[in-house]
Structure formats: structure tokens, C-alpha cells
Amino acid sequence: MVFSKDLPSPATMFSTYASLAGYIMMIKPMIHTIIPRPIQNFVFSYIKSFVGSPQAYLSSKISPDASKLRMTRDPNNKNVNLHLSQGEVVSDVYKGIELKWRYLEGRNKKTTVVGEETEEAIVNWQCFELSFDKKHKDLVVKSYIAYVERKAKVIKEERRIIKMHSYSSYTLRWQSVKFEHPSTFHTMAMTPKLKSSVMEDLDRFIKRKDYYKRVGKAWKRSYFLYGPPGTGKSSLVAAMANYLKFDIYDLQLANVQGDAQLRSLLLATNNSSILLVEDIDCSVDLPTRLQPATTTLGAPKGSTPLTLSGLLNCIDGLWSSCGDERIVIFTTNNKEVLDPALLRPGCMDMHIYLGHCSFEGFKILASNYLGMPHDSDDPHRLYPDIKRLIDG
């Protein structure tokens, strides 16, 4: 065997290979440790969505003639979900094309080397096999798959469980519970004009993803609810969440130890959600740009305190673009004491005043509590007197 003088010797090559192999064996287990868990969860959830979309779509296509099905139900969900079993086939038709979906699942043995120890684990996998005539490949790839994604999104939204998230200063992360507030726009004691205005604004926001992208703005909307105590501000937030099927993130500014932690909390929220800051006038004393900032009690030494500038940057600045389909809601009983920077149109898109009950609102309450129709042609005999007393 002849070696070129430009090539390293066999001993050098073997030494390099041994070092490289040892380096790879050392790095491999470190990947699971170095990569943050949220990134791993994001990657896994992204991969899982490729299976979840066909699964949701096909759940509405399952034939009664299927020989074997799987039935599941989440403990927090009232809906029963039907899924295909191993090898079951579902037929579909799209623009005259016949397609067949087949569900497959299995398990593989995975070996992981950690230091000098070898760990073995069983990894379950599942997938859907889609078959069709190859002459329709372009239509299926460019049109049908997107159609399945859209239909699956609608089905998932109908079955979605709304959650209420709160920040835990003990675990330093968001914790959630199932949100079961019964408030809806139908039961809200609001004037019909205001109610329609809010609902139309929400509908317009949801449908304008392309518009926000075209004008170069973050896909978000902010609402400022103000009025006397007990006039339905929290109930309106619940009605908005139930109407849109959005999760709620209840942010207590008093528990936030600085601008950096506020940014981290907002980055940990999901899309299609509501960020709620209740009673912002009394939750924390936010120093303005002209006031010296003081460190929050209990904050780590050297940390940046929570400031009005930091809050505005997260709501309407560069950090507000980190996410899509977000809604921000501030509530207060005393609008006059807030800094004007929080109330400007660029920060709060819609101001909603919730005052004391009007006569129209009273009729809705009478319908809710007493079962009296509020739009009847034959109103109650006391309604004229009640209207006179409420209107003053």
C-alpha cells in the first residue's frame, strides 16, 4: 500500500479517529442536558402536530363500519374522541380524487449512552399513511394537505379546553387550571350597542392576520376596561375568552421581579391567548421615565427593576411581536391615576367603559335570573317604573 506524502500516517489517522469517537460519545448524552426543556418540548409538539392534524380531521370521517376503534377522553374534557386502530383505513374524497388514510403505530428500542452506562428505552411511534393516484400528487401536496390542516384547526378549536394560567413565584413558571367561567356575551348585562361593538372588533381581529402582516404590525389587540367596582370587567374578560376559546394568563405585576423576568414570562405564553393585568392602578407602583426606578422587594441583587418603560416595550414595543393572535387586557377602577403612556391609542386599541347597570342591562339580568324575555312585545308591567328610576 502506498501513502502519499501529503496524507497523515496511519497512526495519526487512528489517533484522530479515536479522539473523535470519544468526543462524540461524550457529546451525545450532553445534548439532552444542554438543550433547554422548553426547546425540546417545542420540537416534539411541532412534530406531534403533523400527526394531530390528520387525527382530528379523520375523527369526523370515521365510518360506522370500522371493525375496531379507540375511544379516549381527557379527564378535563367532556368530549369523547374516536381514533383509528392499527391498520384501519378511512376513505376520503377531495375535488373528485379518492384518497385513503391508514393509521400505523409501533415501537422501537432506543439506546442512549450516558457516560459509561447504557440506557435502553422503548419509544412508541405513530403515523398516517396517505395513498392516492400519483397523477394527483401536485393537487394533494399543494391543496389537499392545507385543506386538512384548516379543517383540523376548526375541529380542534371546537374541542379546545380553555385554561387559566397564573405565575408561581415558587416554581418560577406558569401553572394552569381548567377555566370554567360561565360568563358569555349572551348573559352579559351590557347595552346591545356596546356588546355588538366588542364582538365585531374581536371578529375583525381574528380574521385580519394577513392585514397585520401586510401593514407591518404585530398580530395583537389590546383592550382597556375601566369603570366602578362590580360593573362586570372580570366577567367581560371571561366572556371574551369563552367567545374566542383563548387561554387567559393572569399576570400579577406585584410578583414580577423586574423587566427581564416580565419578558421571560411573556415569551412563555402561547399564541391565541389573553394576557390579563387586573387593577393595574393598584397592583404595583410603576416608575415613569422621569422617576428613579427602585428594585422590587425580593428581586435578585443587581436585577433590573420593573418599570413602565419595560411594560410598554412588552405590550407595544419590539417584544410584542414575539407571538401571534395575542390579546392584552388592562382593567382599572381609577383611570385618572394612570400614566397617559398606558392610555394612548397605540398602546390600548379600544377603551371600554363599564358603568352602572342601564335599563337594557337590567332586562338581561331579569332574563338570566327570573327567566323573563327581555325582547318580548309584552313587557312586564313594572318595566316603565324601573326604567324611569334607572334613567333618573
UniProtKB/Swiss-Prot annotation:
EC no.?
A: 3.6.1.-
Organism, scientific name: Arabidopsis thaliana
Cofactor dependency = Mg(2+)
InterPro entries given in the database record: AAA+_ATPase, AAA_N_dom, ATPase_AAA_core, ATPase_AAA_CS, Mitochondrial_chaperone_BCS1, P-loop_NTPase
Q: Which domain of life is it from?
A: Eukaryota
How this chain sits in the membrane, per its record, is: Single-pass membrane protein
Q: Which residues bind ATP?
A: G227, P228, P229, G230, T231, G232, K233, S234
Stored PANTHER family: BCS1 AAA-TYPE ATPASE
As its record notes, the protein acts as a catalyst of: ATP + H2O = ADP + phosphate + H(+)
Supply one GO BP term. Answer: response to stress
Q: Show the SMART domains listed in the entry.
A: AAA
Output the Gene Ontology cellular-component terms: membrane
Which coarse location class describes where this protein primarily resides? Answer: membrane
- Alphabetical keyword list: ATP-binding, Hydrolase, Magnesium, Membrane, Nucleotide-binding, Transmembrane, Transmembrane helix
What is the name of this protein? AAA-ATPase At5g17750
Enumerate the subcellular locations listed in this protein's record, separating them with semicolons: Membrane
